[in-house]
Amino acid sequence: MVKCYVKDYPRTQFVRKNWENLNGTWDFAFDDKNCGEKERWYEGFKGNLTIQVPFTYETKMSGIQDEGRHDNIWYRRQIQVDAEKLKKNNYVIHFEGSDFVTKVWVNGQYAGSHRGGYARFEFDISALLKDGENELVVKVEDSFDMQQPRGKQRWIDKNFGCWYVQTTGIWKTVWSEYVPKVNLKAVKMTPNMEEHALELEYEVEAPETLMGEELLVSASVSFKGVPVSRVITAVTSGHVEARADVFLRHNDYGLEWGVRSWSPEEPDLYDVEFQVICRGEVVDEVGSYFAMREIRIDGPNILLNGRPLYQRLILDQGYWKDSHLTPPSEEALIEDIDKIHALGYNGLRKHQKTEDERFLYWCDVKGMLVWSEVAAAYQYTDYAVQEFTREWMEIVKQNYNHPCIITWTPFNESWGVSHIETRKQEQHFTEAIYYLTKSIDKYRPVIVNDGWEHTVSDIITLHDYEEVGEILKNRYIDCKDQILTTEVYHSNHKSAMANGYQYKGQPIIISEYGGIAFNNDDSGWGYGNKVNTKEEFVKRFDEITTGVKEIPYVCGFCYTQVSDVQQEINGLMDMERNFKVDPEVIREINERKVGYWRSFM
């Protein structure tokens, strides 16, 4: 745990003390005729329902549990504001996630809007407030539009395949904070292992008249309470850069000299405290943390801190029975991470979802590797390109500082780019996203289209749900060259590379396999033939997992999946997070060193 940790604080790497959680009971109304704006509901509406924010109306935990489609919904609550605090501070309201178009009014006056369901956004509503009680009204517009990023949300009136009940409206924490008028707006932290330093990029909000020697930003770095360094930087513009030393020299504290690096085995984290100093007075303070770790590609290998990394991943869709995409509590997030570790995995693919940032915090703390994805659209149009690009860039910037994230994965299985194998326009789109991602983060690998039909990609990932281990293994040993040159389809009708692209020696990971259907519900589904006993399950799991690990050039795998999700019954746990088989048995199979992994031991 790090110094700045506050339970339930949503923005875990940028922590201020003066905040308020606005989750809880809100007035609520369906607007199925979409007449609310015309009738000025933002000035007050007759809500005959209440809802428990941040749970969506489709869920049991919302208190409503209506899985029907309602494209326009309204929320209302009162907020208390101290006018005295507003003299030196701005009042900012944050939405961690609200799907899809969110409009906000304060005391009947329009505050702003945001498009996109998965990225954090905020509004400074200071100018609209009065002392004491204020009314906050929110309208959210959603749809079954296949052009908007929707991930695993269905776009018809019933569940099908691996698509589930839609998520409409506010589904993550809503909160507020008083922010000093001169403040640290954001900080980008990049570890530099070679120089034993942390590269810092500050965004500072202040009048231009204060820029210069009278305005400073201080960063104080410590490790387990031991001071490491302090760097003070003059703010000469809204964007300034600095470098902080992270080399431990305090052997009298019982700590070894050197740089403490982050890995799944030893997830060491440094604390850092930021201060904005104006004319000698501290006007803003932010708590944070960071890690020193390097992820890079070296030919067919993925290196973490200079050492080959074998990834034992599991697909994690982040759904819960009674709350769907919204975690029921912070403890539920911790439980998932601990149980994934108990199963012998060192990482996960957070699939088609931008998870609550508290989850990333606990992955940082507990040493869980994360592949970061984004919700897919399912139709290729100019509008879809625009919506996807904007939201993906917001997400990459939002989560850049988390050391647990080692890979960006913007596309999955050609969803939203269904003709990518042959259409240049769709290929160019994925290339553009690759290079845009690299323009923000030049260090992490980018997997442009996970599973098949790769264009430009730092890692080649393949999906294969073959249920016979020997067939799975021999396919990739006997036909490696033919698969990578697309002479042979590795997954029925899918090729590894899109037309016009060649394999260039990148690392290869089997990033989806397994998906064994196993529970007592005959109506559910998984991949391949369902198993009926624990013994059958373990036998197949062992055979296919061992088969994947015995492919000598494959440097990792990702099993489908953590838990059952609604009609999909192929989890290692059910939706209540009960293990289906003894986790120690699964752990032993996962941690057995064979093939590529054994060659580096």
Q: Which residue ranges define each predicted feature?
A:
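Short glycine/proline/serine/threonine-rich loop/turn segments at secondary-structure transition edges
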Residues: K85-N89, L129-E133, M146-Q147, M211-G212, ...
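Short, aromatic- and glycine-rich surface loops/edge beta-strands on solvent-exposed regions
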Residues: E135-V138, E266-C278
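Beta-strand-rich binding/interaction modules
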Residues: V106, A197-T236, A244
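Substrate-binding/catalytic cleft of secreted carbohydrate-active enzymes
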Residues: I337, G347-N578, V585-N590, W597-S599
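Accessory carbohydrate-binding/adhesion or oligomerization-edge regions at the termini
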Residues: M1-G63, K139, S143-Q148, S220-S222, ...
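Surface beta-strand/loop "capping" patches
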Residues: Y178-T209, K593-M601
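N-terminal carbohydrate-binding accessory modules
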Residues: V187-K188, E273-I340, P445-I447, G500, ...
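Accessory beta-strand-rich segments of carbohydrate-active enzymes
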Residues: D8-Q13, D27-D32, Q65-L184, T209, ...
